From Swiss-Prot:
Enzyme class: hydrolase
Main localization (coarse): cytoplasm
Binding-site list for Ni(2+) 2: 217, 246, 272
Record Pfam families: Amidohydro_1, Urease_alpha
Post-translational modification: Carboxylation allows a single lysine to coordinate two nickel ions.
Name of protein: Urease subunit alpha
HAMAP family named in the record: Urease_alpha
Active-site residues per Swiss-Prot or TrEMBL entry: 320
Residues noted as binding substrate in the record, renumbered to the chain: 219
Gene Ontology BP annotations: urea catabolic process
EC nos: 3.5.1.5
The keyword Cytoplasm appears for this protein: yes
CDD domains: Urease_alpha (cd00375)
Length: 567
C-alpha cells in the first residue's frame, strides 16, 4: 500500500488518530480518538477529487442518500473526539460514519448521491450548536449576535427593553408569551420562553405555562420568598417544566438554607450560582452541592480576571435599577461582588461541580461570548492547575469534553430539550457549527441550523469569488422565509401544545414540548456532576469544597481575546 506522511495527510484530509489539534490560541490540545474513514478511501469534493459521478458519488436516488454530507470533520462533543463524515437528512443528523459510493468502496455507511450537497469539513472542528439558557430578551439583535458566536438555542424571558426585562428573565402573562412566540418566527434560532414564577398562589402560573412558556423563572426583584419558591415548583411538577431561580441576595425572606429547604428536593436550575449575578450573599455557592440543584454560571465572571470585580459594580447598578446616590443600593451591589467566590467558581467548573455556562445577555452578561468564555475558563484552569487526572500532558480531551458539555448537552438536559438538541448525535436536529482550529470558540466558519446554512462569514457579494473583503457575518438562505421557520423550533410546555397554541397563535414553525424536566438531577449533568460539601466563611468569604480551600489568582492575560477582535 502507498504511504503518505502524517503532515501531508492532515493537510489533505484533516487530522487522524493520534494527531493533536490546538484550540485557538489556548493551551488546550485535543487528540483524535477514532477515525471512521478507511485509509485510501477518503472522500473529498473538488476538481479532480473523489466525489464525482461513478467515483465517490453513486447513482442512488435522493430518497436513499443524505441531503448534505460534511466530510472528514473532527467532531468535538461530550461523548468523544472523533474524525468522521456526517450525513444530514430532512434537517436532522442521519449518520456519523464513512461517506462514499458503496458500489466501488468498502465500509461505506453514508451513500453520496446526485442529490447530496457537500460541506468540506477537512481540517475543521464540528460541534453541536450552543445552548444559552439565561437570556434576557431585551433586543432582537441579540439573536444574530448569539448565532454568529455558535449558539443555536436561546432560553430565557423578556418582552424587549422593559424595565422588568432589563433585570429579570421573565416573559410575564399569556399576551406577552404569545407575542414573543410570534416574533420568534422571524429568527433562525430555537427559542423557549420562561414565564414569571413569582407568586404564592398557582392560578396565574398555570395560565402562563398553558399559554406557551417552557418553564418558570423566580427572580429576587419580583420577590423570591420561600412561599413563591414552593408554589412555583409545585406548578412545575404538575406540568413537567423547569424552574430557574435567582435567589434572595439580601437574605430578606430567609438565608440560603431556607431557600434550599423550600426546594423540598425538587429539581431547580440555579442561575449564576456563584452569586455575583445575584443570590444569597455570601454563600449561594453552597447550592452546587445538592443533588436537586442544577448549577450554572453566567459569563461575566468567566473566568476570574484582574478586571472582573471592578466591571461588575457598574454593571449591577444599571441592570437592577439601582441608584448610586442611595447608600442601601450601593451596599446591595457591594454585597454581591466577592473576589473569593468568583475565584472558587473557576475551580468548581474545573472539578465539574458547576454544570452549565450561559450569558445573562445585556443584564450583566454578553450574549456573544458564552462559547469563548467557557474555553477561556478551561484554558485558565489548565495553566493554573495543570492537566486533569483523566488527561495527560499530551492532550486535554477529558477537560475539553467537560467544558463543551457546559453549553451543549447539560442545558439541554436541564430544560427538557435534549431529545432535540444539545449534541452531535443521530436523530437530533442538525444544529451544527464548523470551526477552523485557529478560530475555535471565537469565530465560526459555518453555522448550520436544522440542516440549512443559516449564517457564515462572507465577503463582498459583488466580488468574483466569496472571499474578498469586507468579510463579515451575514445571514444565509437558511435564515429567510419559510426555510427559517422550517429549520428552527420553539420549545413550549406539553400543556400548551395540547391546548393548540400553534393554531390559535397562527404559528408556522414547529413547536416541541419539553419533557423529563422534573426527573433530571445533578447526577445527570454529563461530566459535571460532582456534589461537594460546600462551606463559605461569612467573614472572609473563603470557599471550601469537601474541606479543600478553593482559591486561584486572577488572569492578567487571556487567549481568544484581543488577538481576534478589533473592539
Amino acid at each position: 500500500m502507498s504511504k503518505i506522511d502524517r503532515k501531508a495527510y492532515a493537510d489533505m484530509f484533516g487530522p487522524t488518530v493520534g494527531d493533536r489539534v490546538r484550540l485557538a490560541d489556548t493551551e488546550l490540545w485535543i487528540e483524535v480518538e477514532k477515525d471512521f474513514t478507511i485509509y485510501g478511501e477518503e472522500v473529498k469534493f473538488g476538481g479532480g477529487k473523489v466525489i464525482r459521478d461513478g467515483m465517490g458519488q453513486s447513482q442512488a436516488s435522493c430518497a436513499d442518500t443524505p441531503d448534505t454530507v460534511i466530510t472528514n470533520a473532527l467532531i468535538l462533543d461530550h461523548w468523544g473526539i472523533v474524525k468522521a463524515d456526517v450525513a444530514i437528512k430532512n434537517g436532522r443528523i442521519a449518520t456519523i460514519g464513512k461517506a462514499g459510493n458503496p458500489d466501488i468502496q468498502p465500509g461505506v455507511t453514508i451513500e453520496v448521491g446526485p442529490g447530496t450537497e457537500v460541506i468540506a469539513g477537512e481540517g475543521q472542528i464540528l460541534t453541536a450548536g450552543g445552548i444559552d439558557a439565561h437570556i434576557h430578551f431585551i433586543c432582537p439583535q441579540q439573536i444574530e449576535e448569539a448565532l454568529t458566536s455558535g449558539v443555536t438555542t436561546m432560553i430565557g424571558g423578556g418582552t424587549g427593553p422593559a424595565t422588568g426585562t432589563n433585570a429579570t428573565t421573565c416573559t410575564p402573562g399569556p399576551w406577552h408569551i404569545q407575542k414573543m412566540l410570534q416574533a420568534g418566527e422571524a429568527f433562525p434560532m430555537n427559542l423557549g420562553f420562561l414565564a414569571k414564577g413569582n407568586a404564592s398562589l398557582p392560578t396565574a402560573l398555570n395560565e402562563q405555562v398553558e399559554a406557551g412558556a417552557l418553564g418558570l423563572k423566580l427572580h429576587e426583584d419580583w420577590g423570591t420568598t420561600p412561599a413563591a419558591i414552593d408554589c412555583c415548583l409545585t406548578v412545575a411538577e404538575n406540568y413537567d417544566v423547569q424552574v430557574a431561580i435567582h435567589t434572595d441576595t439580601l437574605n430578606e425572606s430567609g438565608f440560603v438554607e431556607d431557600t434550599l429547604a423550600a426546594f423540598k428536593d425538587r429539581t431547580i436550575h440555579t442561575y449564576h450560582t456563584e452569586g455575583a449575578g445575584g443570590g444569597h450573599a455570601p454563600d449561594i455557592i453552597k447550592a452546587c452541592g445538592s443533588d436537586n440543584v442544577l448549577p450554572s454560571s453566567t459569563n461575566p465572571t468567566r473566568p476570574y480576571t484582574v478586571n472582573t470585580v471592578d466591571e461588575h459594580l457598574d454593571m449591577l447598578m444599571v441592570c437592577h435599577h439601582l441608584d448610586p446616590n442611595i447608600p442601601e443600593d450601593v451596599a446591595f451591589a457591594d454585597s454581591r461582588i466577592r473576589k473569593e467566590t468568583i475565584a472558587a467558581e473557576d475551580i468548581l467548573h474545573d472539578l465539574g461541580a458547576f454544570s452549565m455556562i450561559s450569558s445573562d445577555s445585556q443584564a450583566m452578561g454578553r450574549v456573544g461570548e458564552v462559547v469563548c468564555r467557557t474555553w477561556q475558563t478551561a484554558h485558565k484552569m489548565k495553566v493554573q492547575r495543570g492537566p486533569l487526572a483523566e488527561d495527560s500532558s499530551y492532550s486535554d480531551n477529558f477537560r475539553a469534553r467537560r467544558y463543551i458539555a457546559k453549553y451543549t448537552i447539560n442545558p439541554a438536559l436541564a430544560h427538557g430539550i435534549a431529545h432535540e438538541v444539545g449534541s452531535v448525535e443521530v436523530g437530533k436536529l442538525a444544529d451544527l457549527v464548523l470551526w477552523k482550529p485557529a478560530f475555535f470558540g471565537v469565530k465560526p466558519s459555518l453555522i448550520i441550523k436544522g440542516g440549512a446554512i443559516a449564517a457564515a462569514p462572507m465577503g463582498d457579494p459583488n466580488a468574483s469569488i466569496p472571499t474578498p473583503q469586507p468579510v463579515h457575518y451575514r445571514h444565509m438562505f437558511g435564515a429567510f422565509g419559510r426555510a427559517c421557520t422550517g429549520t428552527s423550533v420553539s420549545f413550549v410546555s406539553q400543556a400548551a401544545l395540547d391546548a393548540g397554541i400553534a393554531a390559535s397563535y397562527q404559528l408556522e414553525r414547529r413547536l416541541v414540548a419539553v419533557k423529563n424536566c422534573r426527573s433530571v438531577k445533578k447526577k445527570d449533568m454529563v461530566l459535571n456532576h460532582y456534589q461537594p460539601v460546600m462551606e463559605v466563611d461569612p467573614e472572609t468569604y473563603e470557599v471550601r469544597a469537601d474541606g479543600q480551600l478553593l482559591t486561584c489568582e486572577p488572569a492578567e492575560v487571556l487567549p481568544m481575546a484581543q488577538r481576534y477582535f478589533l473592539f
